[in-house]
Regions:
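Glycine-rich, charged/polar anion/phosphate-binding loops
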Residues: 51, 125-129
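The AdoMet/dcAdoMet-binding core of the Class I SAM-like
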Residues: 1-114, 118-120, 136
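Acidic carboxylate-rich catalytic motifs and surrounding loops in phosphoryl-/glycosyl-chemistry enzymes
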Residues: 101-102, 128-132
């Protein structure tokens, strides 16, 4: 995710990551993909539970928030429980985007994500992209904070 943000010209990225081992393995086995992120001083990594970490973040700090949880119901419930904190740190006019899974494989989960975003922000848009490593079209739900 950080690599894609850098490729789109983001000036500063705060990356909240639970598992340092996953990142180390990605850097080791996928150096072409991860090398740019590792070498970039515009990416600040916060280790640990993201939802705990954002409790300390000042209000309206972020223009964009990307939520990259698994697409199972537990993670949707976890996001729902923490949506107030996510809204608090998103600037007015900012956009929150969540990877919501594959519509053809898990339509109920996508519906639940979309309802969660709609109920909290009053708007939601579903987009998709082909992810080669997932071998399917992957969906993303986005809402703007008005």
């Amino acid at each position: 995710m950080a690599r894609e943000c850098l490729s789109k010209g983001f000036d500063l990225i705060d990356w909240y990551e639970l598992d340092p081992e996953v990142v180390k393995d990605c850097q080791k086995h996928l150096p072409k993909i991860c090398g740019e992120v590792k070498a970039n001083n515009n990416v600040k990594t916060y280790w640990g539970d993201a939802f705990e970490s954002i409790k300390k973040v000042k209000d309206s700090k972020y223009d964009k928030i990307f939520v990259d949880l698994n697409d199972d119901q537990f993670c949707i419930d976890l996001a729902a429980k923490n949506m107030k904190s996510l809204k608090r740190i998103l600037k007015p006019g900012g956009v929150i985007t969540a990877q919501v899974g594959c519509l053809s494989k898990k339509p109920k989960q996508i519906k639940n994500w979309m309802e969660l975003l709609e109920s909290n922000f009053g708007n939601v848009e579903l987009t998709e992209a082909f992810i080669p490593s997932f071998d399917c079209r992957w969906n993303f739900g986005s809402s703007s904070h008005k």
